[in-house]
Amino acid sequence: MPENALYIEGSILDRFLEGKIELKEVKQNKILVVVNKPALPETINAVSSTRATLGIDAEIIELKTQLRLIGHLDKKGASGLVIGDNELVEQVSNYTFDALAITSIIEVSKKTSMDYYQQGGINPWGGVEAIASRRVADKINKPTAHAPIQTEEDKEADKEGEWDFIVDPRIAPEIISKCYLHCVLKGLHKAPRIGKGLSVDDIDVMVSPYGCWGRPHKACEKAGIPIIVVTENKTICDHPYGHCNPVWSKNYLEAAGVIAAMGAGITLSSVRRPLEYTKVLNV
């Protein structure tokens, strides 16, 4: 993640773009890491490694009520069931912290995981993770993120070498390290808090994959923020754009050029070829 990027949970991003909240940039957050009992050695080591290498301020608490995330995947996308999030929110209310990291097993079949790694497609864990972090963030109003823990079945498969194959480069980071907590802690370390600071008025442009349309898009459209749609980055979503007028870009390289042109005050049509003739308006 580059230095000028901000790590923001989805529901907080929605509210920010809708003008309901502002975001305050910080130098450091105190992170609370919540886990099911007992805290696993790999989880403790992950927290220790970020404290030693990044100087992160973090501590772990064990949940009194087990948190369960059950992933579901079909042609429409990834979703799932979250059990125990209300009890989690109640328990963490007794602690002082700035950001919350949740780490737990996501109940997904080994076959589903294997199909994802070998064939690509929809991340089977992402949907239920988003549901969990959104529910919690909405209630505690603090930066929140979830990291999966490897199941015992997956650990046994690791020992047998069943995961030793080449995957799509975009998901390679997920298979080379089975403790996913480090990146979450790194992101939450300086994640902006809800408070006086950046507002939707500071946003110049939104860049979106093709076919996507949700609360962030609607908020940007309402606020008059240009939306760049990257056509090469296709998803399972197929939202039509007939009602709006996005800026079309073939790829992210072109999108970067569009943003640079906007920032320099250059009309986009002037750098496209062929260049249209100047219009003469009749009175």
Give residue ranges: language-model regions:
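Low-complexity, flexible helical/coil segments
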Residues: 19, 26-27, 66-71, 134-141, ...
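Metallocofactor- and cofactor-centric catalytic cores in central/energy metabolism, strongly enriched
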Residues: 1-102, 107-116, 122, 126
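C-terminal functional extensions of proteins
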Residues: 151-153, 179, 183-205, 209-283
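Gly/Ser/Thr-rich loops at beta-strand to alpha-helix junctions
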Residues: 36-41, 101-110, 121-130, 148-155, ...
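Predominant activation on well-ordered alpha-helical scaffold segments within soluble catalytic domains
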Residues: 44-48, 130-137, 182, 214, ...
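Structural alpha-beta junctions
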Residues: 48-64, 95, 134-145, 222-229
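Generic multipass alpha-helical transmembrane bundles of integral membrane proteins
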Residues: 73-80, 92-93, 103, 115-191
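A polyampholytic, Gly/Pro-enriched intrinsically disordered region
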Residues: 78-87, 165-174, 246-258
